[in-house]
Design a protein with these regions (language model features):
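Extended, low-hydrophobicity, polar/charged segments
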Residues: 1-154
Length: 154
């Protein structure tokens, strides 16, 4: 498989049905799911959200009742190195961090996830995605980019 062993292992553990395709960058990210890693005194948290949205950090802090800050690029590099990933993956639970998922992702029928490889993305359906996130916290903590553009023009 053209993706990291940890990705293959995680998908196999869940008996996930998925497709692999060549990655094409859009606005600097791969796939239609973005991720940001945060931390506070309780540890690290991975937030997954839709690629057409902007993360609202204040809403995320209210939702989680935590005082979160973004982890450093060096810490992200360390996470990727430990897992032999070329960049952060958006495949749920691979990073081994507490996970929160934006509601918009759960309303999507199919998702394209960053495999953590420079060259490939993973496509899964909503049911498979829900299986992968397990009992992760969910909520709304993003704003659609299109809503911001429309609001600023009015």
């Amino acid at each position: 498989m053209p993706v990291a062993a940890i990705i293959e292992e995680r998908l196999s553990q869940q008996n996930s049905v998925f497709g692999i395709s060549e990655a094409v960058a859009s606005d600097g990210h791969f796939g239609d799911v973005k991720t940001t890693i945060f931390q506070d005194q309780h540890g690290k948290l991975q937030a997954l959200y839709s690629g057409d949205s902007i993360l609202d950090v204040e809403a995320l802090c209210r939702l989680t009742q935590r005082q979160l800050s973004v982890v450093s690029p060096a810490a992200i590099g360390s996470i990727c190195d430990q897992l032999t990933l070329e960049r952060l993956t958006t495949i749920p639970t691979v990073l081994g961090l507490e996970l929160i998922v934006d509601q918009r992702l759960l309303d999507t029928t199919e998702l394209t996830l960053d495999s953590g490889s420079k060259h490939y993305v993973i496509t899964i359906n909503n049911e498979q995605f829900r299986n992968l996130i397990g009992d992760a916290q969910t909520g709304t903590y993003t704003v659609l980019e299109s809503e911001l553009v429309t609001s600023s023009l009015e």
